[in-house]
Amino acid sequence: MKLLMLCREPRLYSCQRLKEAAKHQGHEMDILDPNHCFLKLSQNPPHFQIFYQENSESKPYLLPDYDAVLPRFGTTSTQMGCSVLQHFEGKGTFCLNSSQAFLNARDKWKSLQLLLKAGVPVPNSLFSGGEVQAHATIPHISSPTILKTLNGSQGIGVILAEKPQSAVSIMEAFKQTNISMLQQDFIEEAGNADIRCFVMGDQVVATMQRIGQNGEFRANCHRGGKTEKITLSDEEKQIAIQATKAIGLDVAGVDLIRSKNGLLVLEVNASPGLEMIEKTSGIDIAAEIIDYIEINAFINSR
């Protein structure tokens, strides 16, 4: 197969592992930055064309047809990356995670709405319009409070407000810069730990527990969190699979937290990193992803 990965940083561990796995299984993979693409729509065939410009001095060239596309772009490239994905979808190419599912996952508030609508348990959450005064929301959420920007990643844009007045001050400051935030219950009984599940289709292929270090409430590995193996019950695995389906994703990293009221889904990531979960679980997730693409690209082509 001829595969394409959409990624701004081809040297990242996840990108390199996927390229190695594809090569090992006899496939060719290109890695291209979606921000170097330009898209053409035409009434006459071919209706969907994608051109690529390597640099400011080079002449754009028409991209060939691919058997499958793997989106691995970050939050700053969401708009263009999803536009490129939509173009490939228009061409009938199999995309591992659709453009709409990617957009669902990248909007934290929309994803919470989709999760709860599908019956997936999530923390109590609030999102308010720009004309709502921050102090008016405080009686409706517990304290301490978690504050999150709508499209952050790797723990960036996540703040713990210990007291109600702190939450008000932080929200008012962010409002001045036109940055919207959602409020969420802080699950104190979980301490500084959460769980990352790697879901592929109808299966949880790997899990790990992440533990924040040195008083850091965020357990993200990018924030220095430690990881260790963890075993989930069948019920907990089903919640992770259900969350992935609710967002519309084929492959996802689902973040879970154990509360006194049961398991809660914190977030569903459309482009989860492979490094720490592969090293912690000992599972070759990159190879599993290529296997999944082989099967589903074949089904898509029939």
Curated annotation (Swiss-Prot):
Mn(2+) 2 binds at E267, N269. Binds 2 magnesium or manganese ions per subunit. This is Probable alpha-L-glutamate ligase. Its cofactor is Mg(2+); Mn(2+). Mg(2+) 1 binds at D255, E267. It comes from the Bacteria. NCBIfam families: rimK_fam. Belongs to the RimK family. Mn(2+) 1 binds at D255, E267. One of its GO terms (biological process) is translation. InterPro entries: ATP-grasp, ATP-grasp_RimK-type, ATP_grasp_subdomain_1, RimK, Rimk_N, Rp_bS6_RimK/Lys_biosynth_LsyX. One of its GO terms (molecular function) is metal ion binding. The gene is rimK. GO terms for cellular component: cytoplasm. Residues 112-294 form the ATP-grasp domain. Mg(2+) 2 binds at E267, N269.
